[in-house]
From Swiss-Prot:
It is found in: Membrane. It is a multi-pass membrane protein. It comes from Dictyostelium discoideum (Social amoeba). The chain crosses the membrane at residues 14-34, 73-93, 111-131, 197-217, 274-294, 297-317, 466-486. Keywords: Membrane, Transmembrane, Transmembrane helix. This is Putative uncharacterized transmembrane protein DDB_G0291480. GO terms for cellular component: membrane. Its main location: membrane.
C-alpha cells in the first residue's frame, strides 16, 4: 500500500539521522565541560591546590579583557556545540522534506546544514589554535590594570607578566621565592580542554556532513527515472510499479490515505495538530530550561517531550500528508507531462453525474441519455443523468459542469483543472478522481475558492510546507482553512492553474 511505501522510504533515511540525534543530545549535556579556565596556587610544601580568584566563566569585571576573552571563547566553543545538537533535528526535517518532495524546503535545509557542518569544526579548530596564544596577554593586561585581585603579592619583577621564560601551550607558571624562606608558590592558569569532546564534536560534524552529501548524491541519482520524467515516490517499490495497477483499484485503495473526502474532514479538525504543536513548544522550551536550570529535575520532561516530538511528526506525516504531500507535487511539470496526465485521467473513467442545462433555443439536449433523468428542475437544469463512467474527456463545449449526484454529498468539493496555452479548455473532475490529480500533477498554483461569498484565497505552498514540517499545521488550518470551511453548504473548489513557461 502507498502508506507502507512512504513509511519504508522514511525509515530507510531516518535510520541515518536518529543515532546522531541521540549522540548530539549527549554532547549537549556535556558541552559545559568542553573547556574551562583553571587557576590555582600550588605550594610546593603542600599537595593541595588553593583556588585562585579567577573563576570559571563568571566573576570577571565587565571592563576586563578577560571578560571579553571569555565571551569570545563561549562564542567559538559553547554556541557552536549547542547549535550542533539541533542539526539532527534539521536533518530529520530534511528527510521529511525529501520524502514529501518539498524541494524548496529541502534545498534550504541542505544549504544551511552543510554550512553549519563545515563551520562548526572550523570554529573549534580555530579556537584551539588561537585562544591559548592570547590568554597570557589578556591575563597580564588585567593584572596590571587591577581588574584581577591576585592572592599573590605583586613584588616588582616577580609577577607572571615579567617572566622571561616562555609559557607552555595551555598553562603558565611562575615561582615566588623570597629571601627569607625557600617556599615556592606556583600559579597555574590557562585553558584546559577535554580533548575527547573536541575530537568527538569534529568527527560528529564531518560524519553528518558525509551522510548529508551521500543522501544528496543518492537523491540526485534517482531524480530521473531514465526517461527524463520526474522521479515519483510510488513508481518503484520492491520492483513493483504502482502505475501498472488497475485504475479502479488505485482509486479505491487510495481513498483511505489520499482521498479528498478524508483530507476535507481532516482540515475541519485542527485540534490534534494544535495540541501537537503545543507539545513541540514544550520540547523547545525544555532546551532552555535545561540550559538555565540544570540537568536534574528537567531530564524527565525533556525526554517526554522528545518522545512527543517523534509521535507528533509521525502523525503529521501520516495524517497531515493529505493536505501537505499532495500539494508539494504541484510544480515542475512540463506540457508533455500535463498531456500524459490527461491521458491517464481518461483511462480511469471515474463515475460522475452529468448535469445539462437547456440550450439557447430551449430545446432538449440530445446527449441526455444514459440512465434516467430528473428533468423539470426549477433552477434551469434540464436533466441529471445517473452516475456513470466517464468514457471520454469532456471539455467546456460539451459539458457545463460536473457534480456529485448525491443528496448527502452534493456540496462536497469539486476539482477544477484549468490548463492554459497548450490546452485551451477547462475541464472538471469529480471528487473520485482527486487522488490521481493530486499525485500526478505538479502545477504551479494552489487556490481555494468559496462560491458562496466569492472569496478567492491563494495558499502559499512554501509557508504551508514549513508550518507542517515544524509541526504547526494546525496554525495553517486556522489561518487559511478554518475561515473558509465554515459549514457544509459551502461549495469549495480547488483550482490548479498551469502556465507553460
Amino acid at each position: 500500500m502507498r502508506s507502507d511505501a512512504i513509511k519504508r522510504r522514511l525509515y530507510s533515511k531516518a535510520i541515518f539521522i536518529i543515532p546522531f540525534w541521540i549522540l548530539s543530545i549527549a554532547l549537549w549535556f556535556s558541552s559545559g565541560s568542553v573547556y574551562k579556565i583553571d587557576s590555582c596556587m600550588i605550594d610546593n610544601n603542600k599537595t593541595t591546590c588553593i583556588p585562585y580568584t579567577i573563576s570559571k566563566y563568571t566573576d570577571f569585571n565587565s571592563n576586563s579583557q578577560l571578560n571579553q576573552f571569555n565571551s569570545s571563547f563561549i562564542l567559538f566553543q559553547i554556541i557552536p556545540i549547542n547549535i550542533l545538537c539541533f542539526l539532527p533535528l534539521l536533518g530529520y526535517m530534511y528527510i521529511l522534506a525529501s520524502v514529501l518532495k518539498v524541494d524548496l524546503v529541502k534545498k534550504a535545509f541542505t544549504i544551511f546544514g552543510i554550512m553549519m557542518l563545515i563551520t562548526i569544526p572550523l570554529f573549534l579548530i580555530v579556537s584551539i589554535c588561537i585562544f591559548p596564544l592570547n590568554l597570557r596577554e589578556t591575563l597580564c593586561s588585567d593584572l596590571k590594570n587591577g581588574f584581577i585581585k591576585s592572592n599573590i603579592v605583586d613584588k616588582g619583577n616577580t609577577t607572571i607578566c615579567n617572566l622571561k621564560e616562555s609559557f607552555n601551550y595551555f598553562k603558565g607558571s611562575f615561582s615566588d621565592t623570597t629571601t627569607t624562606t625557600t617556599t615556592t608558590t606556583t600559579l597555574e592558569w590557562g585553558i584546559t580542554y577535554n580533548w575527547y569532546f573536541i575530537i568527538a564534536t569534529i568527527v560528529f560534524s564531518f560524519s553528518m556532513l558525509v551522510i548529508v552529501l551521500v543522501l544528496l548524491i543518492k537523491d540526485a541519482n534517482t531524480l530521473n527515472n531514465g526517461d527524463g520524467q520526474n522521479y515519483s515516490l510510488f513508481e518503484q517499490e520492491n520492483d513493483e510499479n504502482f502505475e501498472d495497477d488497475d485504475p479502479n483499484d488505485v482509486i479505491e485503495s487510495g481513498l483511505d490515505l489520499w482521498g479528498r473526502n478524508i483530507w476535507y474532514n481532516y482540515t475541519k479538525k485542527p485540534m490534534n495538530s494544535i495540541l501537537l504543536s503545543i507539545f513541540q513548544l514544550f520540547y523547545i522550551g525544555s532546551y532552555f530550561s535545561l540550559y538555565y536550570f540544570g540537568f536534574k529535575f528537567n531530564l524527565i520532561p525533556f525526554f517526554i517531550n522528545l518522545i512527543i516530538l517523534f509521535i507528533s511528526y509521525y502523525n503529521l506525516i501520516f495524517d497531515g500528508i493529505r493536505d501537505n504531500y499532495l500539494i508539494k507535487r504541484m510544480y515542475r511539470e512540463r506540457s508533455n507531462d500535463v498531456n500524459q496526465f490527461i491521458e491517464r485521467v481518461k483511462k480511469i473513467k471515474p463515475k460522475v453525474a452529468i448535469v445539462k442545462k437547456p440550450n439557447k433555443e430551449g430545446g432538449k439536449s440530445s446527449s441526455g441519455g444514459g440512465g434516467g433523468g430528473g428533468g423539470g428542475i426549477d433552477d434551469g437544469i434540464e436533466a441529471i443523468l445517473e452516475p456513470r463512467l466517464l468514457k471520454s474527456w469532456l471539455d467546456q463545449s460539451e459539458l457545463d459542469y460536473l457534480m456529485i449526484n448525491d443528496d448527502d454529498d452534493k456540496y462536497k468539493p469539486i476539482v477544477e483543472l484549468t490548463i492554459i496555452e497548450d490546452f485551451k479548455t477547462t475541464s472538471q473532475l469529480p471528487i473520485d478522481a482527486i487522488s490521481l490529480l493530486f499525485v500526478k500533477t505538479d502545477l504551479s498554483n494552489y487556490y481555494i475558492i468559496t462560491n458562496k461569498k466569492k472569496r478567492f484565497i491563494q495558499i502559499n505552498r512554501g509557508l504551508h510546507s514549513f508550518l507542517v514540517l515544524i509541526g504547526l499545521s494546525g496554525l495553517f488550518n486556522i489561518l487559511y482553512l478554518k475561515r473558509l470551511i465554515l459549514k457544509k453548504s459551502i461549495t469549495i473548489k480547488t483550482l490548479f492553474e498551469y502556465n507553460n513557461r
